[in-house]
Amino acid sequence: MRYSQYFIPTVKETPSDAEVVSHKLMLRAGMIRKLAAGIYNYLPLGLRSIRKVEQIVREEMNRAGAIELLMPSVQPAELWQESKRWEQYGKELLRFKDRKDAEFCLGPTHEEVITDLVRREVKSYRQLPLNLYQVQSKFRDEIRPRFGLMRGREFIMKDAYSFDVSSEAADTSYDKMYQAYRRIFQRCGLKFRAVEADTGSIGGSSSHEFMVLADSGEDAIVSCTACEYAANVEKAEARLFPSEHAEPRELEKVETPQKRSVEEVTTFLGIPASSLVKTLLCVADGEPVAALVRGDHDLNEIKLKHLLGCEELEMASEEIVERVTGAPVGFAGPVGLKIKIVADLTIQGMKNFVTGGNARDLHFKNVNIGRDFTPALIADIRNVVHGDPCPRCEAGHLEMWRGIEVGHVFKLGTKYSESLRATFLDADGKEQVIFMGCYGIGISRTVAACIEQNHDADGIIFPIPIAPFHCIISAVSTKDAEVVAACDELYRALTAVGVEVLFDDRDERPGSKFKDADLIGIPLRIVVGSKNLAEGKVELKSRKGGEVSLLPLAEAVETVKGLVVAALNQ
């Protein structure tokens, strides 16, 4: 493709509404343009990278035995009402009515539609297992769409759904897809981690997220330094700390005037944050609950919500805190509290700690569990922190990372098949419920995540497998007939051996061409100038490492081909 005949509207200035690196660079590189909040046009360069990801996904899905189909974006309300997600999904589900007043939604996901299809068509165990997938645009009405393709309202996604006769067979399907996902992100040239994760609104028994590692990632993840354990911080398990060996001291009231925060109280009392216990008031399905965590730890609301088995969990308002404890925010404590108390595992082994005193400007010292209060539940309800011991092995500790979720796999079990009555007849002619799994990859999000992970001050650094083009040829001067002829010959020869080439034939200054080449992130750049050409050589530069080498013109094609083939076959 010749640059002069292509559509690459690069810009020098960063748009003011762009916040994260990928959003800024995709706009500057002419890959996307905003149409409305969270809705983008994919321009030719951006679309080429998206199609590369799609192709890798399709190849690995097909390799894993999945079969492609395409389902409607518009879905009838009846299916969502059957699964009980019509109201549960919240305002992100864009609902509307047609001219006959029938209710519909724009699909953010397709569990209901695929289950309806399968329940109509699959009748016998002989038709199972079955794995169906699609690549399609989806819509979620995000309240604050931001970060370009990282959190848009409309996005391109691959979603797959497996159907099996038993839980054991479903585990096999899940493992196949898990391995397929690993291959997909490896082939995309990304650094990633597969981590244990919460199932969220999709539901099911267990799940894994695939996280592209990036400092700008929205998600905190942890991994063990010694074993394969990795998890989203929402899901990561905390191990029980050894108990403190100390004799309980007499409970003591201490005045703490205007000292509310952990930092203020611990500084005033001259103690570490690990010797204080925070009492956090929550409301679970309308009922107040007190959650206790150590002063240097944070409450994990997802763990607490699962533990309590509630539908809704939120932090209590100042009014509720004062009504329940008799004190303003900052002075709540478990001693004498008349509501359900849930204590983190860490507190079980603590002795003589500090808590709020349930009165203004008052705290308790030398509080001990069992003597001074008795929790209704003691469980893991905190976020793990860097350096915590691994919950799976004795040798390692947990390290913290930032990640961008690009894929998610779920074991759904019978959640949807039961509510939508998707069944089959087994070998004995008995009706059984189908076991399901679902598997999503954010196609457009993967491209943005790649840029978050691979960039520098000059622009994007695409891995070869998902770059819009493998190589760019830059003619130093388009007025030099020999230079142009050499570029033309290189372009034809590279294209003939399967290398995707962008020939920058514009009548622009070399510096301007090089800046654009760096900005749009083409992995390999061949520079053809009259001086080197007179010696039968061209310059080859790697966008990733910045290495520059002079090659004999006769070797350039095979050298570039070798680099591309090696990257595509990794």
From Swiss-Prot:
<keyword id="KW-0547">Nucleotide-binding</keyword>
<dbReference type="InterPro" id="IPR004154">
    <property type="entry name" value="Anticodon-bd"/>
</dbReference>
<comment type="subunit">
    <text>Homodimer.</text>
</comment>
<dbReference type="GO" id="GO:0005829">
    <property type="term" value="C:cytosol"/>
</dbReference>
<keyword id="KW-0030">Aminoacyl-tRNA synthetase</keyword>
<dbReference type="GO" id="GO:0006433">
    <property type="term" value="P:prolyl-tRNA aminoacylation"/>
</dbReference>
<keyword id="KW-0067">ATP-binding</keyword>
<dbReference type="InterPro" id="IPR006195">
    <property type="entry name" value="aa-tRNA-synth_II"/>
</dbReference>
<dbReference type="Pfam" id="PF00587">
    <property type="entry name" value="tRNA-synt_2b"/>
</dbReference>
<comment type="function">
    <text>Catalyzes the attachment of proline to tRNA(Pro) in a two-step reaction: proline is first activated by ATP to form Pro-AMP and then transferred to the acceptor end of tRNA(Pro). As ProRS can inadvertently accommodate and process non-cognate amino acids such as alanine and cysteine, to avoid such errors it has two additional distinct editing activities against alanine. One activity is designated as 'pretransfer' editing and involves the tRNA(Pro)-independent hydrolysis of activated Ala-AMP.</text>
</comment>
<dbReference type="InterPro" id="IPR007214">
    <property type="entry name" value="YbaK/aa-tRNA-synth-assoc-dom"/>
</dbReference>
<dbReference type="InterPro" id="IPR002314">
    <property type="entry name" value="aa-tRNA-synt_IIb"/>
</dbReference>
<dbReference type="InterPro" id="IPR036754">
    <property type="entry name" value="YbaK/aa-tRNA-synt-asso_dom_sf"/>
</dbReference>
<dbReference type="GO" id="GO:0005524">
    <property type="term" value="F:ATP binding"/>
</dbReference>
<dbReference type="InterPro" id="IPR044140">
    <property type="entry name" value="ProRS_anticodon_short"/>
</dbReference>
<dbReference type="InterPro" id="IPR033730">
    <property type="entry name" value="ProRS_core_prok"/>
</dbReference>
<dbReference type="GO" id="GO:0004827">
    <property type="term" value="F:proline-tRNA ligase activity"/>
</dbReference>
<dbReference type="InterPro" id="IPR045864">
    <property type="entry name" value="aa-tRNA-synth_II/BPL/LPL"/>
</dbReference>
<dbReference type="Pfam" id="PF03129">
    <property type="entry name" value="HGTP_anticodon"/>
</dbReference>
<keyword id="KW-0963">Cytoplasm</keyword>
<dbReference type="Pfam" id="PF04073">
    <property type="entry name" value="tRNA_edit"/>
</dbReference>
<keyword id="KW-0436">Ligase</keyword>
<keyword id="KW-0648">Protein biosynthesis</keyword>
<dbReference type="InterPro" id="IPR023717">
    <property type="entry name" value="Pro-tRNA-Synthase_IIa_type1"/>
</dbReference>
<dbReference type="InterPro" id="IPR036621">
    <property type="entry name" value="Anticodon-bd_dom_sf"/>
</dbReference>
<dbReference type="GO" id="GO:0002161">
    <property type="term" value="F:aminoacyl-tRNA deacylase activity"/>
</dbReference>
<protein>
    <recommendedName>
        <fullName>Proline--tRNA ligase</fullName>
        <ecNumber>6.1.1.15</ecNumber>
    </recommendedName>
</protein>
<comment type="similarity">
    <text>Belongs to the class-II aminoacyl-tRNA synthetase family. ProS type 1 subfamily.</text>
</comment>
<dbReference type="InterPro" id="IPR050062">
    <property type="entry name" value="Pro-tRNA_synthetase"/>
</dbReference>
<dbReference type="InterPro" id="IPR004500">
    <property type="entry name" value="Pro-tRNA-synth_IIa_bac-type"/>
</dbReference>
<dbReference type="InterPro" id="IPR002316">
    <property type="entry name" value="Pro-tRNA-ligase_IIa"/>
</dbReference>
